[in-house]
């Protein structure tokens, strides 16, 4: 198996292992994070109804203006602050953090820390 295929398999294993344990409820929805090479996305999801309550990403102009590159730690911090602001507007204060199989390092950690600093608790 090629190194890239091994990396994808390892990511999928981490993702399914974490997802089996984490479930978002109406009282405490799930903060899901996805990162690509160019962008980072965050959603707050209620798994009981299967709906996305709040979302933010670097694709949106509000988070990406005055950034040269949207796939870095600074962009992740902005998305974290934006998701926290939008969640608090909808009276969502506590969430369950779902790193989606990504290692808790770099952009994922920056987004989580920024969301905590701006009022979300998890």
Curated annotation (Swiss-Prot):
GO terms for biological process: translation. HAMAP family: Ribosomal_uL18_B (MF_01337_B). The keyword rRNA-binding applies. It comes from the Bacteria. It holds the Pfam family Ribosomal_L18p. The keyword Repeat does not apply. One of its GO terms (molecular function) is 5S rRNA binding. Part of the 50S ribosomal subunit; part of the 5S rRNA/L5/L18/L25 subcomplex. Contacts the 5S and 23S rRNAs. This is one of the proteins that bind and probably mediate the attachment of the 5S RNA into the large ribosomal subunit, where it forms part of the central protuberance. The gene is rplR. InterPro entries: Ribosomal_uL18_bac-type, Ribosomal_uL18_bac/euk. Coiled coil: none annotated. One of its GO terms (cellular component) is cytosolic large ribosomal subunit. Keywords: Ribonucleoprotein, Ribosomal protein, RNA-binding, rRNA-binding. NCBIfam families: L18_bact. Belongs to the universal ribosomal protein uL18 family. This is Large ribosomal subunit protein uL18.
């Amino acid at each position: 198996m090629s190194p890239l295929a091994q990396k994808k398999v390892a990511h999928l294993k981490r993702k399914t292992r974490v997802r089996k344990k984490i479930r978002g409820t109406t009282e405490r929805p799930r903060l899901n994070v996805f990162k690509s090479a160019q962008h980072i996305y965050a959603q707050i999801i209620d798994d009981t109804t299967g709906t996305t309550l709040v979302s933010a990403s670097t694709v949106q102009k509000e988070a990406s203006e005055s950034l040269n590159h949207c796939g870095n730690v600074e962009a992740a911090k902005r998305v974290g602050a934006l998701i926290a602001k939008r969640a608090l507007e909808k009276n969502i204060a506590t969430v369950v953090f779902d790193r989606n199989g990504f290692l808790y390092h770099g952009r994922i950690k920056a987004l989580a820390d920024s969301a905590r600093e701006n009022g979300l608790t998890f």
